[in-house]
């Protein structure tokens, strides 16, 4: 199967594989021939449960907010406003989702998410705590999405996110879909 070439500001990257699709875009593992990166292509598909304005602008603003707060996220390497693409550091490792499935979530990962919460909550922010948005590389937990929202109790980690960080009824129901 031929691989697609994807450009970011006229720099060419070769698609290795689709990593996943989220509310705002498709994420691809790409290479420049030397290094691997994640290329996020913004999409404009409807989302029943989320309202968007300018998705690229929102991603850029959210990235800045999360960098200021200081949680572990992949570095943004570049972005292309014309093609609505973001190039970011590739964090190679297992997602919390996969670790939950395999019964391999360690207490240290929960300690690390709690440390993130101590930075996020005073800044009045929530992130998307779904376990596919977290990758462990060299025992360090990274939030690999850039989405963040104003804090609300309903969507905080303790009331929503934690339900998907172990084999709960909610996690198992989602896993069947």
Where are these regions (language model features)?
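Juxta-kinase regulatory segment immediately upstream of eukaryotic protein kinase catalytic domains
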Residues: 1-17
């Amino acid at each position: 199967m031929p691989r697609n070439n994807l450009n970011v500001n006229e720099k060419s990257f070769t698609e290795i594989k689709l990593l996943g699709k989220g509310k705002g875009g498709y994420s691809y593992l790409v290479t420049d021939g030397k290094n691997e990166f994640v290329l996020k292509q913004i999409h404009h598909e409807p989302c029943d449960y989320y309202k968007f304005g300018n998705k690229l602008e929102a991603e850029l603003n959210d990235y800045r907010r999360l960098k200021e707060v200081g949680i572990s996220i992949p570095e943004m390497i570049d972005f292309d406003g014309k093609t609505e693409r973001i190039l970011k550091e590739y964090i190679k490792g297992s997602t919390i989702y996969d670790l939950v499935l395999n019964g391999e979530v360690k207490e240290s990962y929960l300690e690390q998410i709690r440390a993130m919460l101590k930075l996020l909550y005073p800044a009045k922010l929530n992130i998307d705590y779904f376990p596919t948005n977290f990758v462990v590389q060299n025992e360090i937990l990274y939030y690999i999405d850039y989405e963040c929202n104003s804090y609300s109790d309903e969507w905080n980690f303790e009331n929503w996110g934690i339900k998907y960080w172990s084999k709960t009824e909610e996690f198992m129901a989602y896993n069947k879909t």
